[in-house]
A protein has these predicted regions:
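Nucleotide/phosphate-binding catalytic cleft detector across ATP-hydrolyzing
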Residues: 1-192
């Protein structure tokens, strides 16, 4: 899976959606699918995908490395920094991950650090303003999904994971760090 956070056709910006006639003016609707291998998402003004990997970085790693356009860095409330997406995927080794790692592929991976970071990064990417829209002053609504076999049993878990008060920073490519602070309740999250 490749990270899509840029488009050569739109002056180096991520793909933008010019118009969505079905949207409500008082809501910012986010579609977010956190799969076993990648995160796919869209909002009223953008779409994106990135590999579902997160790797904690040593304290000095960010200052030493020159960022690539596809780099995604996540910083939590405690100042811990994680590489996300392609950057994290490239850092994996045979010793640190396997194709049966329960934090990536387990049946109940919703509470794993990787899942939570991937969800936060996906939400942040969907909350970015551009020429075609802004979430400012709007209720954030998240539509996510589960495999049909898990829908009845797991919908409450995924809602529980998404329902939170968020406060974190995100750095995409060569951009500056950007702070995100917002809250979602279970009433803001829909599962299909």
């Amino acid at each position: 899976t490749r990270t899509i956070i840029q488009s050569q056709t739109l002056n180096g910006q991520r793909p933008a959606i010019r118009q969505n006639p079905s949207r409500r003016q008082d809501q910012w609707v986010i579609g977010l699918d956190i799969g076993y291998s990648s995160v796919k998402g869209m909002s009223q003004n953008t779409l994106f995908t990135f590999p579902k990997f997160a790797k904690k970085l040593p304290k000095n790693a960010v200052a030493l490395a020159k960022p690539l356009d596809t780099d995604i860095l996540y910083r939590d409330e405690n100042g811990e920094i994680y590489a996300v997406g392609e950057k994290a995927e490239k850092m994996l080794s045979i010793e640190t991950a396997s194709d049966n790692d329960p934090t990536l592929f387990g049946r109940n991976h919703y509470y794993s650090e990787t899942f939570k970071i991937a969800a936060r990064v996906g939400l942040a990417m969907a909350l970015q303003s551009n020429t075609y829209g802004s979430p400012e002053g709007k209720r954030i609504v998240v539509q996510t999904g589960l495999p049909s076999a898990y829908m009845l049993d797991d919908a409450r878990y995924i809602k529980e994971v998404f329902a939170d008060h968020y406060s974190f920073d995100l750095k995409m490519g060569r951009e500056d760090w950007r702070h995100y602070e917002f809250a979602l309740t279970e009433n803001d999250i829909f599962v299909m």
